[in-house]
Amino acid sequence: MKRKETYLSRDFRETAALRFPAQAKELNTAFDMRLSALLAENADASKEKQYHLKRQILPGIAAYETLQRVMPKEEALQTVHGYVEHLARTSHKQLAALLHIPGLYRLVPGVFVKSTRSVFGPAAGFAPKELQTGNGVWRVDMMKCPYHDICTEYGCPELCRCFCDSD
């Protein structure tokens, strides 16, 4: 069964094709092999954690490691950071456009809290600490984060900031 292409794998392939055309096929193969190995090593993770692993964490690690074959480590980090930042900007624009629909903005706080608790909860490997601040303000400190844990486990803790910066 073919894996669903993520934005990270799509952007990686675009970088390989545009910047390293002579090596693109080799880079894509290396990326695919590394991603397959990472997915196999993490196959026993919960369904909730798999959402983060498959969509962002593991493709990010595979792209970062593979890019280091053809560019310096810092450039590879900035390249992956650019992929994540581009998605964040696009998502922000889409949300901003939706909020122009009359009355929709009133629903956002409730939906945001509910979805955050679901997607970023303990089952996904997070340990959120909710801080009650009052006056309609909701704060969450993440005491444990699978993005940090997995990136550190695979020897690339610096990659975590790519994901954190997009929040």
Where are these regions (language model features)?
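Acidic-enriched, low-complexity/disordered segments with a strong bias for Aspartate over Glutamate
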Residues: 11, 32, 44, 141, ...
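N-terminal, charged low-complexity regulatory/assembly segments
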Residues: 1-67
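Beta-strand-enriched cores of mature, soluble protein domains
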Residues: 45, 49-53, 58-61, 85, ...
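Amphipathic interaction/junction segments at domain boundaries or subunit interfaces
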Residues: 67-156
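Low-complexity, glycine/alanine/valine/leucine- and proline-rich hydrophobic stretches
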Residues: 156-167
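Helix N-terminus capping/helix-initiation residues
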Residues: 17-21, 72, 145, 167
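Generic hydrophobic secondary-structure signal
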Residues: 22, 40, 140-142, 163
